[in-house]
Amino acid sequence: PQTHEGSEGLAALFKRLSRTSPRVNIVRIFEDGDYVFAHTEYDFATSNIGFEVFRFEDGQAVEHWDNIQRRQGPNPSGHSMVDGPVEATDLSLTESNRKLVGSFVKDILIDRRLGELENYIDQERFTQHNPRIADGLSALRSALGSASSNELTIAYDRMHRLLAEGSFVLSVIEGSFGGVHSSFYDLFRISDGKLVEHWDTIEAVPPPGEWKNDNGKF
């Protein structure tokens, strides 16, 4: 919502970014039908981590979404916001993995049925890249449990999109963080029918009065 529509909007954006001597590194990139989604490091005067989603028609990008957060970390287990595997495996399991993450988002994140975490998370190996949370099921349970009772209250309200290729699934969720309307992009890696790794970014959604187009964040 912070960029004007069309080629003129992109030209203005690139001109503005060029003043910061930008550096971009695509860490991992995946394809899901007409969509391409990437996990990216940026240095635009400040160091940021983001997800970029593009929709293509006739070989050209026709729609774009992103979610960008200031780089933080390492987290309590020593992981950065982007390290870990980058290649999708188990391509034949794309749809079952998409379904698994969709159920996790609904049951755990939106409906907060934390007693069902074991149905989704590998109890022996769960690698966490959120800068505030350590590895493992117990750390995730603690983080989700406290997310509704402290000053950084997290509420997941609506899932807008699930993009998948093989072992990687990206969810796009609307909600609030600390009472601020926010966008949550969560990338999961799945192995043997369980979630084994997680990366994410959280970004505040600007109020409509600040939008430069009418498309919204989602």
Locate predicted features.
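C-terminal and inter-domain tail/linker signature
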Residues: 1-218
